[in-house]
Curated annotation (Swiss-Prot):
Zn(2+) binds at C202, C217, C220, C223. Its cofactor is Zn(2+). It comes from Burkholderia multivorans (strain ATCC 17616 / 249). The gene is queC. This is 7-cyano-7-deazaguanine synthase. GO terms for molecular function: ATP binding; ligase activity, forming carbon-nitrogen bonds; zinc ion binding.
Length: 244
């Protein structure tokens, strides 16, 4: 594994959701410069992109020690991905399991494209670390969220760009309860509340009702996972101290 230190800058893939917001805080605690990157690929829950600036501003306002570290935000139009994807993430169709055993919310190649574009931006910006919220513990079976995929992608990107970029995935082995716990460790209850209220997870883009665990329809897989994780976090179930 390539070693990094606090002087290295980081580029965080930031969708506006719980996981990526936690990753932004994780990076701000570690690196002197942290930039963020979002993608508009025609997702049904595009409202998450509208949450991004609110999260960034709240982080700067509530955590002054991080304010000077939070740098530029980048937004990339990847509508072509939505155009070639016939999935419940980009179409108004019912969420179900496909014939291959994967949920039809899986967007083929999404994280591969995200990381490749992120690496190109990081290369241009002089940032050595990419941070993503991929997770192999509480996940929907997406193959591009697996640890093996990220490790292979790091090798391919460094070979293809003749550089030394590191892909960090701090949530890879955490369940959703531990992700809430990590937020508490990083920024106390203030960060937990910020993530609860300001971020968005719901696949169908519902943001009319604020539940105990945040906004959402409460019925889609993303909402159910977030709800279960938050309830387990409050009860202390399966929550040991999350590794920082």
């Amino acid at each position: 594994m390539i070693r990094t230190d606090a002087k290295d800058g980081a580029l965080v893939l930031f969708s506006g959701g719980q996981d990526s917001a936690t990753c932004v805080a994780w990076a701000l605690e570690r690196y002197q410069t942290v930039e963020t990157l979002g993608f508009d690929y025609g997702q049904r829950h595009r409202v998450e992109l509208e949450c991004r600036e609110g999260v960034r501003e709240a982080l700067k306002r509530q955590f002054p020690a991080w304010a000077d570290r939070l740098g530029d935000d980048h937004m990339i139009d990847l509508s072509v991905l939505g155009a070639i994807s016939d999935t419940a993430m980009t179409r108004a169709i019912e969420i179900e399991t496909a014939a291959n055993g994967l949920p039809n919310t899986f967007v083929p190649g999404r994280n591969l494209l995200f990381m490749t574009i992120a690496a190109a931006i990081a290369y241009r910006r002089g940032l050595r670390v990419l941070v993503g919220g991929m997770c192999e513990t509480d996940f929907s079976g997406y193959p591009d969220c697996r640890d093996d995929t990220m490790k292979a992608l790091q090798v391919a990107l460094n070979l293809g760009m003749d550089t030394r970029i590191v892909l960090e995935t701090p949530l890879m082995w955490l369940d959703k309860a531990q992700t809430w716990q990590l937020a508490e460790q990083l920024g106390g209850q203030a960060l937990v509340e910020l993530i609860r209220v300001e971020t968005h997870t719901c696949y169908v883009g519902e943001r009319a009702e604020l539940h105990d665990w945040g906004f959402g329809c409460g019925e889609c897989p993303a909402c159910k996972l977030r709800k279960r994780g938050y309830e387990a976090y409050l009860k202390g179930e399966r929550v040991t101290e999350a590794p920082l």
